[in-house]
Amino acid sequence: MALLRRPADMDERTWLARWHGNHTPVAIATQSTFTYVQNYVVRAITEDAPVINAIVEEHFPPIEAVTSLHAFFGAADDADLQSRMEQMVASTAAFGANVNIDAVPTSRYNFRSPFFSA
């Protein structure tokens, strides 16, 4: 999960266009994600909430993606990894997601419901 903040010197329309229009296809093409959920934060619920403009949820299939850049990016070899990383760095920098970002590793577990049979 990543918490994004829009750079103060970038207007909202440009930021959203670069994030949704330009970055999204790059993120999908260069990483081994099977889910990419973009949540745009329109307002804070409490007065003293920190500024967060977006919450991104990404799901990576192999546990190896936690410790291996090759697995994280779905790279076939070192050259492919380098290319994918360069694309991501350029793409995130274009809308300010290369600075002032919080990344929170999480896990997802599916439990059976005691109320429904599978």
Protein language model regions, located:
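Macromolecular interaction modules
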Residues: 1-118
